[in-house]
Amino acid sequence: MYRVGLIERVESVAGSEKLVKLTVEFGDRRRTVLAGLRTERADAKAEIEGRQALFVVNLAPRKMAGQVSEAMLFDIGYADGITPVLALPERAVPNGARAG
């Protein structure tokens, strides 16, 4: 299941060269999401904090770098070898809105 969430906070993950920790508001709850953005973006905090994006939320929690990720950021381009971009709604929608 895909839902829109507001990226409220972006933080570095100690001991990881790739991961950032996102705090994401989904309307009914906040989730921690770990994403490998540090190697893709010069300043992930400035680029994505405060923006809405699409997340996969029906995955089992996954432990990475000693922390638990409760969803997965949906991005476009990584599989094709281009710098990934976020899947964003064209205008603001309620946090937690479902895609599809």
Predicted regions and their residues:
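Phosphate-backbone binding interfaces of nucleic-acid-interacting proteins
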Residues: M1-G100
